[in-house]
Amino acid sequence: MYSTFFSFCAIVLEKEANSMELNVREENLRNLFKQFQVEHNENCKTVFIDNNDEDLKNYLNESSTVYLHMVDYEIKHLDLSKVNTIFVNKEYASKLENGIQDEQRILELLLNKYPNLRVVLITDKKGAYYKDKDMMIYQKELVSNFDKDLFLVKYMASELKENSEMTSLYRGVNQ
């Protein structure tokens, strides 16, 4: 079983009875963020969730730390001010910002709307940006087998170990 702990939370591939963890179930690691389901209990305050998940609004109304994986364009109805971090690829981000193609401009516009948001933008150049109100980091791919789904898993595993954003970005991109 694979697990990474952050306070009382974990990403686990197998459900354990009576666990005090956030359980994310999926058949294998590479597909973890494609179609995952989140199981939440009252002791876990960190949630990793797709923006089309039917339980998202409930998590946004709680005191959870929400990591939001953007999988479709319909977010205008969501209050992103309650989201800690969003993961979005350039195609989706461009559509959110009226077709703008410049990655740095997309990041700037998202942060203008939501100043406390942390954004991880996966580019079509085989790399990724991290941006928050204090810094911006770009990490280009150093190897030639960039996989966007594996990027998400590796980034989150690093973040849950309380590594810096720079370290998490590097580990996500360089699989």
What does each model-identified segment do?
Residues 2-138, 160-171:
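Ribokinase/PfkB-type carbohydrate-kinase core domain
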Residues 138-159, 172:
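Short glycine/threonine-rich catalytic loop with a Thr-x-Gly-x-Asp
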